[in-house]
UniProtKB/Swiss-Prot annotation:
This is tRNA(Met) cytidine acetate ligase. GO terms for biological process: tRNA modification. The lineage of its organism: Bacteria, Bacillati, Bacillota, Clostridia, Lachnospirales. The gene is tmcAL. It is found in: Cytoplasm. ATP binds at residues 7-20, 101, 161, 186. Catalyzes the formation of N(4)-acetylcytidine (ac(4)C) at the wobble position of elongator tRNA(Met), using acetate and ATP as substrates. First activates an acetate ion to form acetyladenylate (Ac-AMP) and then transfers the acetyl group to tRNA to form ac(4)C34. It comes from the Bacteria. Signal peptide: none annotated. Keywords: ATP-binding, Cytoplasm, Ligase, Nucleotide-binding, RNA-binding, tRNA processing, tRNA-binding. InterPro entries: Rossmann-like_a/b/a_fold, tRNA(Met)_cyd_acetate_ligase. Pfam families: HIGH_NTase1. Its EC number is 6.3.4.-. Belongs to the TmcAL family. It is an enzyme of class 6 (ligase).
Length: 403
């Protein structure tokens, strides 16, 4: 059997995602579609609006054959690390190819950009360093350098929806993987578009509908399975500000153990993943213990520190994701199965003897490996309880979803 991979968050799953699944099966001619999905936290530095098991069920009903979880360390990483974790997971699962959404289906140009970033020629590096010296954030500086170095790829470089596409290809090329890649031209609203007039709304736009209680519009854009999960859920939607109390308490605790010394406070914060000394100092200066997460992030962001990075840093503090953990994730430590159908079961049976890392189907047998992800899920469940008074099942009580 031949498998093709999709990397997703399905936050939440909408009709545009189904379009991608159908195109993936058509383009790749795969027998099996494997989805590597973020769990309860997503790459923007936010909680998923609904838990990973509900999203897994909806994904399987919409056409996925297997859903595995992207470990939270990767799920809350930069685009580069997010893509690396997902691509390496698909490689471990013997996927022959990967399909991803982009604003172009020009795979050659996407690969050209990826190779430029990997090779870092002296000319490209000089342009990049100059842009960084001018105070641009790294993503903005890289875009500036690529535009000057590869003017023929201008439209692709400036497309925000191409960032992850480039990172997926980069991960494949950098790791010398034998994996074919297929960009799928996006249809409908873009990733950050909140329009509700396109045939396919963006997940961002749908989250805004959820936040505004515009449930009457949801049925138009969500898959039937996702709409049913959200309608019947006692634990959604969840948003970043629902974690504000947890964040403020955590920051106050760190400050207290530093004896309210701002220098020590900043040094402690800089131990967390992706928090530079500059970001740590900005956190210390902005922190009052009274802001919600959105207000705090808006205070801290700057010209060269983008909002989504600040949100990830906040989640790293909440979830105890530290720089010292990075060595444990140089390679995929395990693969955790969230759900499958009959086709997926057949595929898993065909590859199980070829897997090089633990393939987790029963969480109770891998408590040591999953202890960190368990803790993250418990924090998600705590936010649900504080908002809705609903007690979610813990990870040992949850069953794999079978369709």
């Amino acid at each position: 059997m031949k498998a093709c991979g999709i990397v997703a968050e399905y936050n939440p799953l909408h009709t545009g995602h189904v379009y991608q699944m159908n195109k993936t099966r058509q383009i790749s001619q795969a027998d099996c579609i494997i989805v590597v999905m973020s769990g309860n936290f997503v790459q923007r530095g936010e909680p998923a609006v609904i838990d990973k098991y509900a999203r897994t069920s909806a994904a399987l009903k919409a056409g996925a054959d297997i859903v595995v979880e992207l470990p939270v360390y990767y799920a809350l990483s930069s685009a580069e690390n997010f893509a690396k974790g997902a691509v390496l997971t698909l490689n471990e699962m013997k996927a022959a190819s990967i399909c991803f959404g982009a604003e172009t289906d020009n795979a050659d140009c996407l690969a050209k950009i990826s190779r430029t970033i990997i090779s870092e020629s002296p000319e490209y590096k000089a342009i990049l360093n100059k842009a960084l010296a001018e105070g641009l954030s790294y993503p903005a500086a890289r875009q500036t350098a690529l535009l000057e170095y590869l003017p023929e790829c201008k439209d692709i470089i400036t497309g925000s929806n191409n960032i992850l596409a480039i990172e997926y290809i980069k991960a494949i090329l950098y790791n010398n993987l034998n994996m074919t890649y297929y960009p799928v031209l996006r249809e409908g609203a873009g990733y950050n578009d909140d329009s509700d007039t396109a045939e396919y709304a963006s997940a961002f736009g749908i989250r805004k509908m959820l936040m505004s209680d515009e449930h009457d519009k949801l049925k138009t854009y969500l898959t039937a399975g996702m709409y049913e999960e959200i309608s019947n859920s006692k634990s959604c939607p969840l948003f970043p500000d629902d974690f504000s109390n947890i964040f403020n308490h955590k920051m106050l605790f760190i400050k207290q153990i530093c004896n309210i010394n701002n220098t020590d406070f900043a040094e402690k914060l800089a131990e967390y993943e992706d928090i530079s000394p500059d970001i740590a100092n900005r956190f210390v200066a902005a922190f009052t213990g009274r802001d919600n997460i959105t207000e705090f992030a808006m205070k801290v962001k700057s010209k060269n520190i983008v909002y989504s990075r600040i949100c990830r840093c906040i989640m790293h503090i909440i979830l105890e994701i530290r720089k010292s953990m990075s060595d444990s994730y140089n390679n995929i430590p395990y693969i955790r199965l969230l759900g499958f159908n009959k086709t997926g079961q057949q595929y898993l049976g065909s590859i199980k003897k070829e897997l090089d890392v633990p393939f987790i189907t029963k969480a109770a047998d891998y408590k040591k490996e999953l202890i960190f992800d368990f803790a993250c899920s418990d924090i998600y469940a705590q936010a649900v309880y504080e908002k809705y008074g609903y007690v979610m099942k813990n990870e040992l009580q949850q069953n794999i979803i079978r369709i």
